[in-house]
């Protein structure tokens, strides 16, 4: 019996196993049995018999094991229960698989006159059960779906139902899978299925959301198959087009710019393929809507640039048939109107669209009408360049340049010349807007991309040369960018547009963004890497002699445009040049005899040319610093370079003795390791010792940095310590013996001021400070101790001893530096409180030794010195807290110190500094997490607010005692008081700190304003304040500070309201004072609610008060009452008007 006959017989429920064996053989690639060959050999009747038999087999299998009894994935995965799948279900799954395979092969083998009704029934049965298959049968589901897909492709009867199933599955997969490329291809091939489903039907509504989700997916939008599918969706239903468009608009802000171009392509494809009502809908609902958005959206909108990108894609398709006509028709009702809009941003947006789509015309019009339309549009370009708004003019400049670049060949030459002259001669010099000038230079690059423009541009561009010196940096950047474009496009000689002299002058003085571009422009001229290295050096010398400042700038940025190896080569060739100059200077007879063989450099340069020598040395340092990291990374190159310069540097130091040469030589030495210059260290230290007090920073800065880079900073510290110790006014017994060091330079003059200058320089610069603080404590403690000793001289001066002014100044500086050094050391070594205790001892010393002179000073000199000492101590302590070095104990110690200062007779003179210290204490308290320390922190805040109240009282007292001095004190305290009140933003409105601070301020202001009112003896003396300056000095100062910050003003008004509600204010003069405060605050046009509430409360209380004493009131009280009520009414009316 043949295989064909055996297979046909096996398709029966009684021979199921044989059937399954044949299916297994078909799936086995190594076996020759192939169902496709078997079906191809079957006669028509045999194929019909096969389909009938397999239908019955499938029906029998589903009767034996119906889908309702199948064990699904839920049961298979159920907890700890083991669910066994029956033999019947296993066999049924195998039969379904076999039937699916036979059906799929049969679809491919169908012939024209075949009756495939039973095959269709079989496929429909599979369609009915595919969704009920267990999760483990996913491959079987996929095989069934493939059968339906093949059915659709063959365009067989019943394809709609089967194709819909396949379409839904593919759609779901493309939305859910991370990499849906293959599914996208299948979905695209099945897209026509969608047209068989009505949009309004249940099936149609079922797929709307998944279809719209496709527009969220970047994979769909970018892939070719995805674009085809998404563009096809526009042809399903006109209502669906609007839904698609709204979905895309909502997603545009989240799309990257690169994706917007693909979205534009989808729109364009949809438009190209659409016709009839679909075309009308796409044009009106989508394209024209995008046009409207591009015109009306703000430029800072996240969507605007994406909408512009989509329309730009359409504009670039103008060469395609029908695009020009469509753009002309859709722009007509919106664009020309927008170009004349009153809103400048709309006009600017319209300008960009108009120039991008230029020329906008209908190809179906006659040539005469087209010419007329284009001429009108050219006239419009000129009008836009003259627009009164800079934003529109800038947009017009960009647009005109893009039009000229695209349409140079078709625009009349006279019009081109007029437009370019407008840009270059007028708008490039637009004094009203740097943005317009910047646009001209940036957009010239667009025109230069068209080579046809070069001859005319070469004639016109030199008129722009003065723009290199424009007052706006961004204009200068754009101008140099234009020169770079001219050079790259070879449109003209850039030095004919702007001379080399001007470029070098601007390079010398300009900022990095401009100078870097100038270096790029001139790089090949002064650093021609394709020529011999000697030429590099010659160009370097030429640049130095032309403009030394520009030369330094040029080589500062040269590393950006060449390899580090070339920079090192230039350094070495400059070294060689210097060596030759030195050699020639030492052997003049040899130099003169060898003149015929001398190079150009040897003829130009000589050691006596100090300026050129110094410039070459400076450039060496600049070049080395620019490639220092690269050199360090290549140790072989580093060792070679340091060896070369290490051998030459001692000779340079010997020959080049001029001051200008010494600085770069020291810097060059600092870049070399100390081992390369063993003899130089002593010379450097000798230089530091030889300087005189008051020497300029430039004379020692490089030397200090050089020693730091060598790791020799300990020698500087030792020198400073020796000078301070030897010049110290009081030497403890055994000090010199206890140092354990022998000093050979004790006969030298001590220079403590210069030592303090060195210390100041090292503490201020991060690099030197880091080096200083890396020293071990054993080397830092002697310096710390030496600084501390100078306190005794301050006390001696206060005690009446004769001390020179210079010595006092030195002692005061040493006292300050002692505090500064303590801060750095405590921050570096926070484990213990050694240096914090030292600061506490200094504070205690001030209290014990200095504060008595604030109580009773016999001379102005004593008072001035004691005040300076206290202020210096307070400033140091403030900085301790500012850098978070102090702890709670230190903070409490400082509060006690502030209280002690305020109790002295002249302590008020330190109030500005004390307020600054209180600010840092308050900030620390309010920002501290008081876990387990709530009581201590609360006590500290209470003491703080009491001290602040004392400060306010002292200010009021000084004003009463000496008005002029009090006013000066208020003015000097204003900034510190402002900073103190800003700390209140770190706390809640009704906190203990807030209440304490603002209750003191409110009371002070009310008392200060009401006191003059109580002294009025005549009605004419009553004056109403108009500004804060009309108030008494203390209240004026407090309100100025309060009104400087809305949050502080709100806290002040809150406390004022609480005082009124508590009825703590009970006199007509105090209510008048409150009204004066409200009158001043209302001028800010803010705090309407607070002002209205307070004014209402005051009016009620003052009315009740006056009703009770009106019979006994005198004329002055009545006048104060009437003026107060009038001001209150003005405040309330003002609040009402502001609300309206």
UniProtKB/Swiss-Prot annotation:
Primary localization: nucleus
Keyword Signal listed: no
One Pfam assignment: Condensin2nSMC
Effect of inactivating the gene: At 3 dpf, mutant animals exhibit cerebellar hypoplasia, a reduction in the anterior structures, including the optic tecta, and an increase in cell proliferation in the head. At 2 dpf, aberrant mitotic cell-cycle progression and an increase in cell death. At 4 dpf, renal defects including renal aplasia, hypoplasia and enlargment of the proximal renal convolution tubule are observed. Morpholino knockdown results in reduced head size, increased cell proliferation in the head, increased cell death and increased renal-tubule diameter.
Protein location: Nucleus
Stretches forming HEAT repeats: 460-493
Assembly: Component of the condensin-2 complex, which contains the smc2 and smc4 heterodimer, and three non SMC subunits that probably regulate the complex: ncaph2, ncapd3 and ncapg2.
Protein's recorded name: Condensin-2 complex subunit G2
Gene source species: Danio rerio
């Amino acid at each position: 019996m043949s295989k064909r006959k055996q297979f046909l017989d096996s398709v029966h429920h009684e021979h199921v196993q044989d059937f399954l064996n044949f299916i297994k053989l078909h799936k086995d690639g190594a076996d020759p049995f192939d169902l496709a060959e078997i079906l191809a050999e079957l006669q028509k009747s045999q194929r019909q018999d096969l389909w009938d038999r397999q239908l019955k087999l499938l029906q029998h299998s589903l009767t034996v094991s119906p889908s309702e009894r199948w064990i699904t994935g839920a049961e298979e995965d159920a907890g700890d229960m083991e669910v066994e799948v029956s033999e019947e279900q296993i066999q049924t799954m195998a039969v379904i698989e076999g039937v699916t395979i036979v059906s799929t092969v049969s679809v491919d083998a169908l012939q024209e006159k075949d009756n495939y009704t039973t095959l269709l029934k079989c496929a429909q049965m599979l369609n009915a059960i595919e969704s009920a298959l267990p999760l483990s049968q996913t491959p079987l589901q996929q095989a069934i779906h493939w059968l339906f897909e093949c059915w659709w492709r063959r365009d067989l009867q019943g394809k709609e139902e089967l194709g819909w199933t396949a379409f839904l599955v593919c759609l779901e997969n493309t939305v859910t899978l991370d990499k849906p490329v293959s599914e996208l291809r299948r979905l695209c091939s099945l897209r026509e299925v969608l047209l068989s489903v009505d949009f309004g039907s249940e099936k149609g509504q079922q797929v709307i959301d998944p279809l719209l989700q496709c527009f969220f997916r970047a994979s769909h939008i970018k892939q070719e198959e995805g674009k085809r599918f998404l563009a096809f969706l526009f042809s399903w239903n006109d209502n669906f087009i609007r839904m698609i468009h709204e979905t895309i608009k909502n997603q545009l802000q989240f799309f990257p710019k690169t994706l917007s171009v693909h979205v534009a392509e989808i729109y364009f494809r949809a438009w190209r393929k659409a016709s009839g009502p679909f075309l009308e809908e796409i044009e009106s609902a989508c394209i024209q809507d995008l046009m409207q958005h591009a015109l009306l959206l703000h430029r800072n909108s996240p969507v605007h640039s994406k909408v512009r990108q989509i329309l730009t894609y359409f504009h670039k398709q103008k060469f395609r048939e029908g695009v020009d006509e469509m753009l002309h028709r859709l722009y007509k009702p919106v664009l020309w109107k927008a170009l004349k809009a009153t809103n400048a941003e709309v006009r600017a947006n319209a300008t960009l669209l108009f120039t991008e789509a230029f020329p906008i015309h209908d190809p179906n019009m006659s040539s005469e009408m087209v010419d007329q339309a284009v001429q009108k549009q050219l006239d419009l370009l000129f009008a836009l360049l003259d627009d009164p708004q800079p934003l529109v003019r800038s947009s017009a400049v960009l647009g005109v340049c893009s039009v000229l670049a695209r349409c140079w060949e078709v625009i009349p030459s006279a019009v081109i010349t007029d437009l370019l002259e407008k840009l270059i001669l007028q708008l490039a010099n637009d004094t009203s807007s740097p943005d317009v000038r910047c646009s001209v230079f940036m957009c010239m690059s667009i025109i230069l991309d068209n080579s046809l423009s070069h001859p005319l541009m070469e004639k016109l561009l030199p008129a722009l040369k003065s723009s290199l010196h424009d007052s706006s940096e961004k204009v200068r950047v754009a101008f140099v960018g234009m020169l770079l474009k001219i050079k790259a496009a070879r449109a003209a000689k850039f030095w004919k547009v702007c001379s080399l002299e001007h470029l070098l002058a601007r390079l010398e003085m300009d900022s990095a963004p401009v100078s870097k571009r100038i270096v790029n422009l001139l790089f090949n001229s002064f650093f021609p890497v394709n020529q011999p290295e000697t030429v590099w050096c010659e160009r370097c010398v030429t640049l130095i002699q032309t403009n030394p400042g520009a030369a330094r700038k040029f080589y500062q940025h040269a590393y950006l445009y060449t390899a580090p190896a070339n920079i090192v080569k230039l350094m070495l060739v400059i070294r060689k040049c210097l060596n030759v100059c030195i050699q020639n200077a030492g052997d003049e007879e040899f130099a003169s005899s060898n003149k015929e063989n001398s190079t150009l450099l040897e003829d130009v340069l000589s050691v006596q040319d100090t300026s050129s020598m110094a410039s070459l040395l400076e450039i060496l340092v600049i070049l080395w610093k620019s490639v220092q990291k690269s050199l360090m990374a290549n140790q072989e190159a580093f060792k070679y370079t340091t060896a070369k310069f290490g051998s030459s540097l001692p000779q340079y130091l010997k020959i080049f003795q001029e001051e200008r040469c010494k600085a770069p030589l020291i810097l060059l030495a600092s870049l070399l390791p100390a081992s390369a210059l063993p003899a130089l260290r002593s010379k450097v230290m000798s230089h530091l010792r030889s300087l005189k007090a008051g020497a300029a920073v430039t004379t020692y800065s490089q030397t200090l940095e050089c020693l730091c880079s060598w790791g020799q900073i300990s020698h500087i510290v030792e020198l400073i310590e020796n000078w301070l110790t030897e010049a110290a006014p009081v030497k403890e017994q055994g000090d010199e013996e206890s140092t354990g060091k022998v000093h050979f330079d004790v006969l030298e003059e001590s220079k403590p001021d210069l030592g303090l200058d060195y210390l100041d320089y090292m503490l201020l610069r991060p690099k030197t400070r880091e080096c200083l603080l890396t020293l071990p404590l054993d080397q830092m403690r002697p310096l710390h101790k030496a600084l501390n000793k100078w306190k005794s001289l301050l006390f001696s001066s206060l005690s009446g001893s004769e001390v020179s002014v210079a010595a006092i100044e030195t002692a005061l500086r040493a006292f300050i530096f002692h505090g500064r050094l303590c801060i750095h050391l405590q921050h570096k070594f926070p484990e213990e409180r050694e240096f914090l205790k030292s600061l506490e001892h200094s504070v205690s010393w001030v209290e014990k030794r200095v504060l008595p002179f604030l109580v009773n000073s016999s001379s102005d000199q004593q008072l001035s010195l004691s005040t300076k000492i206290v202020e210096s101590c307070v400033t140091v302590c403030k900085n301790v807290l500012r850098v978070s070095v102090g702890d709670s104990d230190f903070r409490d110690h400082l509060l006690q110190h502030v209280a002690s200062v305020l109790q002295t007779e002249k302590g008020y003179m330190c109030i500005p500094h004390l307020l600054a210290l209180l600010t840092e204490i308050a900030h620390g308290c309010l920002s501290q997490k008081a876990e387990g320390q709530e009581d201590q922190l609360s006590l500290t805040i209470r003491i703080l607010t009491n001290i602040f109240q004392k400060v306010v009282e002292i200010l009021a007292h000084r004003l009463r005692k000496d008005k002029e001095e009090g006013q000066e004190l208020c003015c000097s305290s204003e900034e510190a008081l402002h900073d103190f009140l800003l700390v209140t933003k770190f706390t809640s409105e009704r906190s203990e700190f807030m209440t304490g601070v603002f209750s003191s301020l409110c009371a002070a202001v009310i008392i200060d304003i009401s006191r003059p009112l109580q002294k009025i003896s005549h009605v004419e003396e009553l004056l109403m304040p108009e500004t804060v300056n009309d108030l008494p000095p203390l209240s004026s100062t407090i309100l100025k500070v309060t009104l400087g910050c809305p949050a502080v003003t709100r806290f002040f008004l809150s406390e004022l309201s609480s005082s009124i509600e508590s009825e703590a204010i009970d006199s007509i003069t105090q209510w008048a004072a409150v009204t004066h405060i409200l009158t001043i605050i209302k001028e800010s046009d803010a705090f309407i609610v607070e002002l209205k509430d307070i004014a209402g409360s005051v009016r009620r209380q003052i009315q009740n008060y006056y009703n009770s004493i009106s019979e006994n009131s005198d004329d002055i009280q009545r006048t104060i009452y009437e003026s107060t009520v009038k001001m209150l009414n003005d405040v309330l009316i003002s609040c009402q008007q502001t609300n309206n």
